[in-house]
Every structure is written in C-alpha cells, then in structure tokens.
Amino acid sequence: MHDELSLDGISVSRNGRNLLENIRIDIIRGKKIAVTGPSGSGKSTLMKLLVSDDESIGRIDNIILDGKPVDATDISSLFAYSSQYPVVLADTLWFNLTLGRKIGKQRVMDVCKSLDLDDIVREKGFDYVLSADGTGLSGGQLARIELARAVLSERPILLLDEINASLDSRTDMDIHHYLWNSNLTFIEIIHHYKKEDLKNYDAVIDVSDYS
C-alpha cells in the first residue's frame, strides 16, 4: 500500500467545456475525503478521470506517488470504483463479489456483514446466480454488492460516487459508520448529507470553488 498520492492541477471538462480547474487532492493512507457540489458540476467526471486517464474529460498536471513523480497511466490501478449505478455480472453472487480472485470465505462474509449484505447471503447463498440487469434484487442490494466488490478488491483507494442514492436511511448510516471507522482510504462524492456528517471526513473538497 502506498502512503501518499498527490494530484495537482486537475482539470475536468465536458464536451470541450471546462467544468473544473486547478483542483489539488492529497490522498493519505487511511484518510477519508468528501467531494461536494451541485448536480452537473463535474464531480462524477472527476472520478472517471482518476480511473480512466481519459484526456477527453480532463487532465492531471502533476502526480506525486510517495514522493516520486509518476504518469497518469501509473495510478489507475490504485483505484476501485463504486457508483450510484452499480454494475453486476450474469454470474454467481460469489463471483460478483470476488471477480474470481482467491479470497477467504470468512473475509467475504465479514465484508458482507459490515455492508448489510449478510441477509442476502443467508437467503440466497453465494451460489445464487444474478442476471446482468440485476432482476430480483433491489437497487440498494445491487449498490451494496458493488461496494463490497470494491472493498474486497484490496485496491489502495476507493472512489465512491453517491453510493447511498438507493439506500434507505438506516442502511446508509450503518454502512457509513463502517466506512468512517475503517482503515479504508477513500474519496466519496456526497450529495444528500447532514452538515454534521462532514466531521467524519479528514478533508472536504467543494468543487464549486474550482468552477
């Protein structure tokens, strides 16, 4: 696990128009960063830029990983992405969680319990086969499956894009208590939140300051 990633001079664009300019993000292991701002301001595009290195949606001028300059192509593998539009595969629940990697069953069960997925595991089992469109599961269940997959990926940094969009308030709070109190490193786009929730993050980036 890397200790620190600094991204400086981040610009985000859409259809040739700059949305955000000159953002700096310092990501330190174990820290939690919230990203706020109005709808359509470029928050999700910012996340996509980090995982894709797509020059058509923006650029990052300077990238420093553990004190050494690196290229954008060197950092995409550091991130695991979980969004408000979860993607599932036409395969077993186990494969959707692990993507075929060798992960101990207890580790998978522990993450499922932390993310309120243990009820699905008890009811359907890990051999339950999902359809590609998620038929038979709620939006909240699909979102939690994708989030669990991201956590189990063991990627150093999670990118969380409005993961609570389809969660009820109790599940949302349970999951966030787990995330806030974990040793996970993540950047999270938050839209509907209480002001007091911000104290659970080590840094808050309001993209309105960079538009």
Where is each model-derived feature located?
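Walker A/P-loop
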Residues: 44
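ABC ATPase NBD Q-loop/coupling interface
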Residues: 61-78, 131, 173
